């Protein structure tokens, strides 16, 4: 109501914008996980514009994907719920959503999730230890699969053998 808006403004609160979810189930065929169902009624309507006018991740990501003609998105399984929400955003823009694939997250040698606190396993940390980029890419191409580790010389070689159906569901150890 107008009274509520004025009250909030007088308290110094500024408005933010949310994307209204449908409350329906968002169903999609994931390239790695198979059929995925995200129940948007169990999610809060995502904030898309902060009080300061800055945008949050989901909506700009969707718009960028539309503008760039992105057809496939492969990302960590921690983004499955985001994908269900983003599918609704694509639909609201009158666009088809890309094809999604969500891979298990990598863990360290102890089975713990990677963290920013472990700088030794960061790209910079590996570079500082003189690891060759293609050696890292070669290893990464086989983690979480039954594929033997090979020494590849180009990303094209890796993309030629990459088969998402061979990815396991358990976290890969690095």
Describe the predicted segments one by one.
Residues 1-80, 86-87, 93-99:
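NTP-dependent nucleotidyl-transfer catalytic core
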Residues 81, 93-174:
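Catalytic adenosine-cofactor/nucleotide-binding cores of aminoacyl-tRNA synthetases and other
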